[in-house]
Design a protein with these regions (language model features):
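Short, hinge-like loop/turn segments at secondary-structure boundaries
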Residues: 86-92, 141-143, 234-235
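Active-site rim/loop-helix segments in enzyme catalytic domains that contact anionic ligands
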Residues: 60, 67, 71-110
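Divalent-metal (Mg2+/Mn2+/Ca2+)-assisted nucleotide/phosphate chemistry catalytic cores
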Residues: 93-219
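Catalytic adenosine-cofactor/nucleotide-binding cores of aminoacyl-tRNA synthetases and other
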Residues: 144-147, 221-255
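Catalytic beta-strand/loop signature of glycosyltransferases that borders the donor
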Residues: 74, 218-221
């Protein structure tokens, strides 16, 4: 397959949206420029599921095209607790130690799909390495680029307000922490599920404000079950990559 055909497949298959535009990203790739990109994974469980497969397959495509790909373990963001899609505040928040322990299983499972060694290996990083070192001044400098109105506009927060459910300040600030990942690593592109669009665009805003650098965002479609509910840990309909082959087949066929 020719390089142009590989780029066409990368941008056209298993992709929901590209920001600011597919045309600009395609032009950049056809110019021969190699990008630095990442996807973050908060290991709030110990199993990757088929919903992660779409992103991991994209990782492999970017990797095979010679780009610098980072598999980011969100042990720092995971402590804050991503509120995306959650109708209530979590009953408990994870510690950095718990998240790093879960990450071992994530990496073992991801190795079956992407390469962490050999030619152009995917890099493994932990955002706790820099988020845990942020000072008060650092956090204030990040926060000044966002408004409460911007953050509170999110669908799940609006739904909570209507139902008089609490919004924990810890999870409220989550997008700012994820946004800082892009700044610290100075990436060219962030990859993630379409439900992460708000968080990823926050990173685009912050990177432009703090480093004067533009970042592409590529979102992948979410997998849903037969009821149209997103497959995920919180929804309780996970189909884990570690399931026995027969169980895995049966669960997939029931979607």
């Amino acid at each position: 397959m020719k390089e142009a055909e590989k780029i066409e497949e990368l941008l056209g298959r298993g992709v929901d949206k590209i920001y600011p535009s597919r045309e600009l990203l395609e032009e950049t790739l056809l110019s021969g420029k190699k990008l630095k990109l990442y996807q973050g994974f908060d290991p709030t469980g110990d199993k990757l599921h088929i919903g992660h497969m779409v992103g991991l397959r994209k990782h492999r495509q970017w990797q095979d095209l010679g780009h610098e790909v980072i598999f980011l373990i969100g042990d720092g963001t995971g402590e804050a607790g991503d509120p995306t899609g959650k109708k209530k505040t979590r009953e408990r928040f994870f510690t950095s130690e718990e998240l790093r322990e879960n990450a071992k299983d994530y990496l073992a499972q991801a190795r079956k799909i992407v390469r962490f060694d050999g030619p152009n290996p995917i890099k493994i990083m932990y955002n706790g390495d820099w988020l845990n070192k942020l000072t008060k001044t650092d956090i204030l400098n990040i926060a000044e680029h966002f408004s409460v109105q911007q953050l509170i506009e999110r669908d799940m927060f609006q739904e909570r307000l209507k139902k008089r459910e609490s919004i924990n300040l810890r999870e409220f600030l989550y997008p700012l922490l994820q946004a800082y990942d892009s700044v610290h690593m100075e990436v060219d592109l962030e990859l993630g599920g379409s439900d992460q669009t708000f968080n990823m665009l926050a990173g685009r805003t912050l990177l432009k404000a703090m480093k004067y650098k533009e970042k592409f965002v590529m979102t992948t479609p979410l997998l849903s079950d037969s009821k149209g509910i997103k497959i995920g840990k919180s929804e309780g309909n996970v189909i884990a990559l570690t399931d026995e082959p027969n169980d895995l087949f049966g669960k997939i066929m029931s979607l």
